[in-house]
Amino acid sequence: MRSIWVTFSKEGIHKYPGVDTDPKLATGNWDDVSFLGYSHRHIFHFKVWIEVFHDDRDIEFIQFKRWLERLYGNDELQLDHKSCEMIADDLAVTIQEKYPNRYIKISVAEDNENGCEMEYPDNYSDNFINQVI
């Protein structure tokens, strides 16, 4: 498969509801992460790959990156309860609406330390929408 990729970063705020009452997560020991239940800030780092069908700027890098950045505006992202995986899923649906029938891979990382890498087949948004309905 042939693809291009772009990167960008956005400041965002999110939280992990219920983490403070889940005994697997609110342990009171070295592995306690109950603090994640409070709104907290990250720099979310995105890397987005998209399938292209030829080698002469099928999708131009800079235009694709600028379009992705504009999706999120200039303010910090208010993500509420969304995980990196949920952020990637939402972005994949939006990308496939503009660029249908293309394989997409999205990496979303918190502070470039921890994150996810998600792969979406060329019909992901159709399947995702059918699951929601």
Specify the residue positions occupied by each region the protein language model found:
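Charge-rich, low-complexity N-terminal segments
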Residues: M1-I133
